[in-house]
Amino acid sequence: MGKMKNEKYNIQELLQRDVYVNDKKVGTIVGERHHPNEARVRSMRIQVESDVADEYMRKPAELAPLPKELVHSIRNDGTVKLSKSMRELQRRWRNTVRIDEKLYAPDEMQDRAVLDNQGREIGVITKLFKIKRTYKGVIVKTRLGIQKDFAVEDELRIPITAFSRTRERLDEVVLSRTFEKVLQLPSYISINEINEE
C-alpha cells in the first residue's frame, strides 16, 4: 500500500515543497539527479534545515539525499510527509559520501561519469567501496583511451577525497587534479591495495 502511494509523485509535483517528519521540518526538496534512466533515480535532493543538519549529521551539510521511498504523502497544507522517523533519515545520511560539503547517496553516484580537472573523461562509476563500514571510494570502469595512455586496469578505485565537485546537469563528478596526479596520491595507492569488505 505504502509503495503505491509514493509511486504517483513525480519531481515536478514535489519541487520546492517543505518536508516534515511529524511536526519537524527537515528541509525543502530542490531537485533530483539528471539521469536518462528514471528507474535509477531513487533519491531527491533536499536543502536541509541547519538545526536538523547540526543534530542529525556527523558533519553538517546543506544539501543531502532524500530517498523517494520515504515520501509518504503530500499533506493538505502542501508539505511533504515522510513515512519514517528522523532516526531512519539519519541512518540513510550516514550511508552517503560527501563531496564539496554536500551528501550523496550511493544511487546518486552510480553511473556518473568521472572527469579529471582538465575535463578528460576517465570512466564511469560502477559502485561504491567501503572500508570499516564507511564509503571511502568509488569503483570506476575506465575508458579504453585511459587504459592505454596510463597503463591502468579496466577497473580501478578512486578515493572520495580525490573529488572536488559534482556537475549536476551533466551527471558528472570532477577530480581535484589531473588523472596523472591522482594516480600518485597516497590515498589512491592505498585504496587500490586494500581488499574489499
Q: What are the functions of these language-model segments?
A:
Residues M1-E197:
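Peripheral interaction segments used for macromolecular assembly
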